[in-house]
Every structure is written in structure tokens, then in C-alpha cells.
């Protein structure tokens, strides 16, 4: 048998409280950056990805116009730097944070692993696991959590990704927190011809990554197992399920 796969998902956490209404520390970008630096993403990608995960520091994957390979390792594991950033932000003694999680898709395992790394820099994390999708989604929009576990790999055009995941009021920004600098780049992107959008889309990725609006941990693939007697099983970022019309007997 043969195996074909394409990266479609980034497992990590989303900061739901970027204004610091529930967890004041999260309003400071240095704190969010510290929480990224505190995680050994190389180790987690090997363990949680079944040996096939890839450590990442960005939500954007190959196939998206905003993908920038140079950002993939932006937050390399650095506990000393994480602690210094917390100190600089006024949280040398850490703080407490509650994360919304769920038992499906390996979310609880990821949450627990991340929490153990955060504990090492003084951040006490409580995991509130919801047993069903409905309860998880209710919690996501409740305004009660500082963050939530997420699976949000962006392979679509950046404008679509923004409207889905970053725009104030979207599912992953339920607090409707405005981000003026990001919105200015988005406005520029919307006014740019699609054939020339790449450089501007990468600016969106750069801003989201540098401001640590998320905690990406690892990228995972969607795999297809198929017989060597056929060919044309070539999933892509824009067409994850192979087109059945392209599947033909192997020559």
C-alpha cells in the first residue's frame, strides 16, 4: 500500500481574551509571546503527531497565500526567554489561566502537555474539558475563558481565513477584540489584486505570529492509504480529497 498526505491542520491554542478582561496578563503581547516560547514544540510534534507532526509557530500552512516558511520556527523553545518576557511584562511570579478543552481529536492531551510547560514558567493552567462538541462551542462563545484548544490550519486565501478565525466576532475571536493594525493590513489586502496578494498576505501572517495571537504547536496531515495499482491520488492544500476523475490505473 502507498500513503499520500497533505497538511491541513494546526493544533494549538487560541487566546480568547486578548483584551485581558478575564486574564489581565493576556493583554500584553510579551506574555503571549512568553507562552509560545515556553513550549517544546519539537518534542510535542513527535509525540502528539504520531511521528509525523511538524512543529510550527504560525497558523498558515503551505498552500495559503500567507504562508511564510521563515516564520515556522519563530518561537523556538526558550524557557529563559519566556521567563524574561513575563518579568518584563510585570508577571515574574506568573498568573492563573483557564483553558477550554475537549476529549476529542486529542485536544485534552495537547492541553495537558502545554499546561505542563507553562507550569515551568509559573503559569498555573486549569483545563476545563467539555464532553461534547455542543458544550465546547457554547464555552467558546461564553466569554468565560482566557483561551481554548484549537485546530486551525489555514490553507485557504488569507482573507477567508481572517473572516473565519481572526475577525472580531468570529468563532475564534468571540470577545470581538479589535486589532487595528491587523485590520489595516487586511484592508490593504482586500484592495490588492489576487495575483499580487502574496506579499501583503504574508504581512498578515507576520503580524499574527509576532503578536502571538495564537499558540500554534504542530501541523498534522490528512492521509490517504491507497493501492499501488492506481495513481493520481495527490491531495493538495486546496483540494484535500483527491479528485476521483484523476485516479487511474498505474502504468
Located regions from the model:
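Short helix-loop capping/hinge motifs at secondary-structure junctions, enriched
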Residues: 19-31
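Structural transition elements
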Residues: 22, 54-88, 106-107
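A local structural motif
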Residues: 92-98, 116-130
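Envelope-exposed proteins and targeting segments
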Residues: 9-11, 95, 121, 213
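Short, conserved helix/loop micro-motifs enriched in His/Cys and acidic residues
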Residues: 64, 87-101
Amino acid at each position: 500500500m502507498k500513503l499520500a498526505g497533505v497538511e491541513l491542520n494546526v493544533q494549538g491554542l487560541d487566546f480568547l481574551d486578548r483584551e485581558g478582561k478575564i486574564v489581565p496578563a493576556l493583554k500584553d503581547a510579551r506574555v503571549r509571546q512568553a507562552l509560545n516560547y515556553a513550549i517544546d514544540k519539537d518534542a510535542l510534534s513527535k509525540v502528539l503527531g504520531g511521528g509525523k507532526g511538524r512543529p510550527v509557530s504560525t497558523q498558515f500552512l503551505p498552500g495559503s497565500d500567507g504562508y511564510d516558511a521563515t516564520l515556522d520556527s519563530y518561537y523556538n523553545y526558550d524557557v529563559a526567554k519566556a521567563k524574561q518576557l513575563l518579568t518584563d511584562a510585570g508577571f515574574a511570579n506568573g498568573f492563573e489561566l483557564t483553558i477550554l478543552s475537549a476529549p476529542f481529536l486529542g485536544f485534552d492531551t495537547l492541553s495537558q502537555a502545554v499546561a505542563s510547560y507553562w507550569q515551568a514558567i509559573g503559569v498555573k493552567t486549569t483545563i476545563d474539558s467539555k464532553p461534547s462538541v455542543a458544550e465546547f462551542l457554547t464555552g467558546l462563545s461564553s466569554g468565560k475563558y482566557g483561551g481554548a484548544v484549537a485546530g486551525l490550519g489555514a490553507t485557504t486565501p488569507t482573507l477567508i481565513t481572517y473572516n473565519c478565525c481572526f475577525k472580531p466576532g468570529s468563532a475564534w475571536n468571540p470577545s470581538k477584540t479589535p486589532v487595528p493594525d491587523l485590520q489595516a493590513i487586511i484592508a490593504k489586502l482586500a484592495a490588492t489584486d489576487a495575483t499580487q496578494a502574496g506579499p501583503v498576505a504574508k504581512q498578515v501572517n507576520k503580524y499574527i505570529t509576532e503578536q502571538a495571537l495564537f499558540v500554534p504547536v504542530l501541523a498534522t496531515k490528512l492521509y490517504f492509504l491507497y493501492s499501488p495499482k492506481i495513481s493520481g491520488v495527490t491531495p493538495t492544500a486546496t483540494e484535500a480529497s483527491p479528485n476521483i476523475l484523476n485516479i487511474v490505473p498505474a502504468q
